[in-house]
From Swiss-Prot:
Domain Peptidase A1: 96-384
Cellular localization per UniProt: Secreted
Record GO cellular component, one term: extracellular region
Annotated protein name in UniProt: Probable aspartic-type endopeptidase MCYG_06955
UniProt keyword Cytoplasm, yes or no: no
Top-level enzyme category: hydrolase
Gene Ontology MF terms in the entry: aspartic-type endopeptidase activity
Domain of life where this protein originates: Eukaryota
Biological process (GO), any one: proteolysis
Natural source organism: Arthroderma otae (strain ATCC MYA-4605 / CBS 113480) (Microsporum canis)
Family, as annotated: Belongs to the peptidase A1 family.
Active site feature: 112, 278
Region forming the signal peptide: 1-21
Coiled-coil features, chain-numbered ranges: none
Length: 388
């Protein structure tokens, strides 16, 4: 139980730091505000099997047996921005980021409710680590805190470290004149390679967090309130099992195509690392029985052992996938499950993949079609259909 209490306390402290600085935001009361993601056009080519491996690693799950270390390294090394395979941005879900201003510098950060640190790329990094990133210059506007250093490590093995400065921060019109900012002096190569973002803003809120992500369009994060204009119908709530410190709950069935299994109960963790689309928890990772039944409805689909996941011809029309939440049906459009094309082929990699050990994980493929409420009062989690 200590895990969630520690993180929730850290989030609430950061909320107080922001809300005390600005009592009114866009007509809302203190502590209630919205963030709209910004579109970012990236030339980086992601190799889908590597992204699956990275997701499994983040959640401490073993990779599929056929996905060897050699193939992972080969995939990652050859299919980056300097790779030889040409892929147009439209073949992947467009990338979206969250814009902030630190000092006089505009940066793009990931919003992460799974961590409590606020750190950014800085001019104190080695020059090779700064390449293709927007940089915070603490020497221009910041006040260094003597004898203050930091280090962050994440579940996927990545990390960063550096010094601490006080500086002004602006997030969606929410202004703080003297915020502690962790300026990186070292970051792992994965963050250097991830050119879409320049740091992580880790925080949570006292009451609830809400996310409304979109498919190939900017999503929203509303903090402290529920915007009724963004969903249809009354949200359906499920209790959370927080024993392991996760947003974990039990669903009571699923359906796909002609298959309707309303008695198959399964536990799942709802991905709450708000990084869209290709970092954090992008996939829906469900029990093997569910994924096999879904792909049995997809013509010419096959389990690709070399790449460790289900794939299918890119011109295939995919059926919707539905998760039963009491009387509510959470529909994931088939088009959202067409996650990415394997470079140099006419084969697409699915956003729905199997996971060997419970619980299942519902990441971006699920979230971007849903209106989801993370409510710390309970705790509980709510689901409703997005309003188009």
């Amino acid at each position: 139980m200590m895990g969630p209490f520690f993180y929730f306390t850290a989030y609430v402290s950061l909320l107080f730091a922001f809300t005390q600085a600005l009592p009114t935001i866009n007509g809302a009361t203190a502590g209630l505000f919205s963030i709209e993601q910004k579109q970012y056009r990236s030339n980086r080519v992601n190799w889908p099997p590597y992204e699956l491996w990275r997701t499994l690693r983040k959640h401490h799950r073993p990779p599929p047996r056929g996905m060897t270390a050699v193939s992972r390294i080969k995939a990652y090394g050859e299919h980056t921005i300097n790779g030889t395979v040409e892929v147009t941005p439209s073949e992947y879900d467009t990338e979206f980021v969250n814009e902030i201003t630190v000092g006089n510098d505009t940066l793009y950060v990931d919003i992460d409710t799974g961590s409590s640190d606020f750190w950014v790329f800085s001019s104190q990094l080695p020059e090779q680590s700064q390449r293709n990133h927007r940089i915070y210059h603490p020497e221009e506007t910041g006040t260094k805190l003597p004898k203050h250093t930091w280090e962050s490590k994440y579940g996927d093995g990545t990390g960063a470290a550096g010094n601490v400065f006080l500086d002004k921060v602006n997030l969606a019109g929410l202004k703080v004149s003297s915020q502690a900012v962790e300026a990186a002096t070292w970051v792992s190569y994965e963050f250097v390679d991830q050119q879409t973002t320049d740091g992580v803003m880790g925080f949570g809120f006292d009451n609830f967090n809400l996310t409304c992500l979109k498919h190939q369009a900017p999503g929203f994060y509303d903090f402290g309130f529920i915007d009724g204009t963004k969903h249809v119908g009354k949200p359906t709530y499920l209790p959370i099992d927080s024993l392991r410190g996760w947003w974990e709950t039990t669903f009571n069935g699923f359906s796909a195509g002609d298959i309707d299994n309303s008695t198959y109960r399964f536990k799942a963790v709802i991905g709450i690392n708000f990084e869209l689309p290709d970092t954090g928890t992008t996939f829906m990772l469900l029990p093997k029985q569910i994924t096999e039944q879904y792909y049995s409805t997809v013509p010419a689909s096959m389990y690709d052992r070399n790449n460790g996941g289900w794939a299918f011809p890119c011109n295939t029309t995919l059926p919707n996938f539905t998760i039963h939440i009491n009387d509510h049906k959470a529909i994931v459009p088939g088009e959202h499950i067409r996650w990415a094309q394997l470079p140099g082929t006419n084969t697409c990699f699915g956003g729905l993949q199997p996971v060997n050990n419970p619980p299942a994980i519902l990441g971006g493929t699920f979230l971007k079609s849903q209106f989801v409420i993370f409510d710390y009062d309970g705790p509980k989690i709510g689901f409703a259909a997005q309003r188009n």
